[in-house]
Amino acid sequence: MKLLIDVGNTSLKAKLWQNEQVQACDLNNLPWHAITHVIYACVGRSELLNAILAQAAFNSISCFEAKVTKTLGGLTCAYEHFNNLGIDRWLALIASFTLYPNKACIVVDAGTATTIDVLNCDGQHLGGWILPGLDLMTRSLTQNTQRVFDDENTPFTNQLGINTPNGLKNGALVATIGAINQAKPYLNDKNTQIIFAGGYGSLLQQQFKESIFDPMLVIKGLNYWYELDENSNKL
């Protein structure tokens, strides 16, 4: 059994991996007797992660931090300075590459930031974009303009706004939808799979036919990263 930990900008997500399945866990009552590996990735800092790693060390459990590399198991990073690619983006790409082999993918992780990455059917990452997340996009306008205001009860939709709050929120949503659509010509592939993850992934997925929302995409990527990294070290 593996303990998989994803430390994002605003939260820590932890799951157990056993029998090729993601399982829920209670961080206050982890089954240390059954855990063989801890695999983690950090975008932000976390005192909770440090405490978990200390517990793992106390139980003599090996810990592995996921890192970005130029290549991994047939997947190639587009960045010349690959260390500058966020590990969460790399893990989402690894998961998409593994789950949808030989398929072109647009991978969207919609959290504090919205990242859009383009992957061709040969496993070549073509690059991507980093946008403000929907909340950050709307907040930046309300904080930096005098007459634009928000309403927390107003939902995000793709309709024209008929008042300031839904003009603001709908504008943020359609801007993000437009950015995702702009990625399609880079692949020129009618069978492109669009995959969404993150807090607003489900909302965005509803705007694209035959797309997929996978809330565990980055967590799955952690497991696949470990497996691919282990295999590459054996060669």
Swiss-Prot record:
Substrate binds at residues 79, 86-89, 164. It is found in: Cytoplasm. InterPro entries: ATPase_NBD, Type_III_PanK. K(+) binds at residue 109. Its EC number is 2.7.1.33. The active site is at 88 (proton acceptor). ATP binds at residues 6-13, 112. Pfam families: Pan_kinase. Catalyzes the phosphorylation of pantothenate (Pan), the first step in CoA biosynthesis. Belongs to the type III pantothenate kinase family. This is Type III pantothenate kinase. It comes from Pseudoalteromonas translucida (strain TAC 125). The lineage of its organism: Bacteria, Pseudomonadati, Pseudomonadota, Gammaproteobacteria, Alteromonadales. The gene is coaX.
